[in-house]
C-alpha cells in the first residue's frame, strides 16, 4: 500500500509547479494501477485546505473543485480511506517526542504513524519523512527511496 503526502497531490493539480508533470503522471498511474492507495484524512483535508488557500496559490482551487478531485479519488477501486487505530494519537506523539520536534512535522508524523501501522510506503517529495525511523518512503519526482532504518522506541 502507498500513502500519498499532500505535497505530491498538490503538485499533481498545480500546473504552475515545476513538478506538475511528474506528479500528475505518478498520481494517474497510482489511481489506475492495481496496488492499494491509502488516503489519510489528514491528507484529504490538507489537500483541500492548502489547495484552496489564496496565500499559497495565485490561482487557488475553489472548494467545489477541490472536493470534486477528492471525490474522484474516493470512487477508485484501489483507494481506501485509512482508519486510525485507537492508539494513533499516542503513536504520533511518540514519533514527535522521539524527533524532539513538532511544529511543521505534526502532519508528517500523523501520516508516518499511519504508514507504520499499515505497513505502507509514504509517497512524498518532502525530505522530512527521512527523519522517521523505520518508515518506508519513496519520492516519485526524483525516484529516490528510503533505506529502511530500524524502528526506534518512538515508532
Residue ranges of model-derived segments:
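Active-site neighborhoods of divalent-metal-dependent phosphate/nucleic-acid chemistry enzymes
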Residues: 78-123
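Extracytoplasmic
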Residues: 47
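Short, well-structured N-terminal submotif of metal-dependent ribonuclease cores
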Residues: 1-3, 7-39, 54-68, 145-154
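Acidic, PIN/NYN-like endoribonuclease modules and their adjacent C-terminal/linker elements
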Residues: 112-155
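Ligand-binding beta-strand-loop-alpha-helix segment within the catalytic cores
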Residues: 73
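Structured helix-beta-strand junction loops
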Residues: 33-34, 76-77, 118, 132
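Short beta-strand segments at enzyme active-site cores
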Residues: 38-41, 82, 124-125
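Conserved glycosyltransferase catalytic-site signature
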Residues: 6, 41, 105-109
Amino acid at each position: 500500500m502507498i500513502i500519498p503526502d499532500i505535497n505530491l497531490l498538490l503538485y499533481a493539480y498545480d500546473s504552475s509547479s515545476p513538478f506538475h508533470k511528474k506528479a500528475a503522471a505518478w498520481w494517474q498511474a497510482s489511481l489506475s494501477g492495481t496496488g492499494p492507495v491509502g488516503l489519510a484524512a489528514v491528507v484529504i483535508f490538507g489537500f483541500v485546505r492548502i489547495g484552496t488557500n489564496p496565500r499559497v496559490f495565485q490561482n487557488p482551487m475553489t472548494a467545489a473543485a477541490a472536493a470534486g478531485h477528492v471525490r474522484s479519488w474516493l470512487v477508485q477501486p484501489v483507494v481506501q480511506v485509512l482508519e486510525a487505530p485507537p492508539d494513533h494519537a499516542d503513536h504520533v506523539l511518540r514519533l514527535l517526542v522521539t524527533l524532539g520536534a513538532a511544529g511543521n512535522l505534526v502532519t508528517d508524523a500523523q501520516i508516518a504513524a499511519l504508514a507504520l501501522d499499515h505497513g505502507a510506503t509514504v509517497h512524498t517529495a518532502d525530505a522530512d519523512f527521512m527523519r522517521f525511523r523505520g518508515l518506508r518512503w519513496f519520492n516519485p519526482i526524483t525516484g529516490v527511496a528510503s533505506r529502511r532504518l530500524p524502528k526506534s522506541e518512538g515508532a
